[in-house]
């Protein structure tokens, strides 16, 4: 019951705290192309995460489940939207259903709505190999997300305080999983060193989950009597974290998430090196405040606008979009310079 109540708290406070932190994409400018040699009608948006083929570089990221009828209804609606647009979708952490079988329906509903969809199971880094297998089976998942949420746990009144052995547990899950494993942050970004560690144990896909979207430190602080306000602005901005990711030179697939709300955000994230992008809080707010049809329409517009931007840049495919020239400036440039990451190749390609 405590876990289910927490799930509902997360929805309430995620909506009330909003997405007030900056994601850094304002520091990224495309180099205008006056002769793009492109046509809107020939633009294609297919992409891949590892060996998973996706029809769109936009997917619905992990949000909820395990909070009774309300979370079941949210996942049901999101699965409908995913089916309508042929988008991949992740569920929220399934530990609630592993601890209480009665909560499993709030996750299983996605397969009932969209039997042939691409879905990602989701567990925290405390999960065992056996729990990972059960989570995958629960939703007949095509991949498994393992989320890293140290700052959220530390801020959570009842959260974990021991994070030893996490990399070793992830390695065991990777070695034993029958589906690809995606390791994701939850809004605090990832450094290049973290991604190198993950690659060293066999992880092949990473969701950088940068600062700029839903602020889980602020969410958990709303549930505390004594706020840990020093965590509210903690983390690496989304744009910066994508560049940190690509600087590792590992054969990894990268998912950009963290405050992405517009087609321009999507285009910039991909041009920086992401293979795809993920939306969570922005989609949840539209769904809860304006309804499912408004969300369907918004995703239509995102795809239309992305193709307009790709046409303007002369990028006919997602792969070509990853190679267009851009300029990195401001705080993002300053951070990357201090971190010893050369950005000149972005502007000269």
From Swiss-Prot:
Transmembrane segments: none annotated. The keyword Ribonucleoprotein does not apply. Its EC number is 5.3.3.2. Keywords: Cytoplasm, Flavoprotein, FMN, Isomerase, Isoprene biosynthesis, Magnesium, Metal-binding, NADP. Its cofactor is FMN; NADPH; Mg(2+). It is found in: Cytoplasm. GO terms for molecular function: FMN binding; isopentenyl-diphosphate delta-isomerase activity; magnesium ion binding; NADPH binding; oxidoreductase activity. FMN binds at residues 62-64, 93, 122, 184, 214, 258-259, 280-281. The keyword Metal-binding applies. Mg(2+) binds at residue 153. Signal peptide: none annotated. It catalyses: isopentenyl diphosphate = dimethylallyl diphosphate. GO terms for biological process: isoprenoid biosynthetic process. GO terms for cellular component: cytoplasm. SUPFAM superfamilies: FMN-linked oxidoreductases. CDD domains: IDI-2_FMN (cd02811). Substrate binds at residues 6-7, 152. Belongs to the IPP isomerase type 2 family. Involved in the biosynthesis of isoprenoids. Catalyzes the 1,3-allylic rearrangement of the homoallylic substrate isopentenyl (IPP) to its allylic isomer, dimethylallyl diphosphate (DMAPP). Homooctamer. Dimer of tetramers. This is Isopentenyl-diphosphate delta-isomerase. It comes from Bacillus thuringiensis subsp. konkukian (strain 97-27).
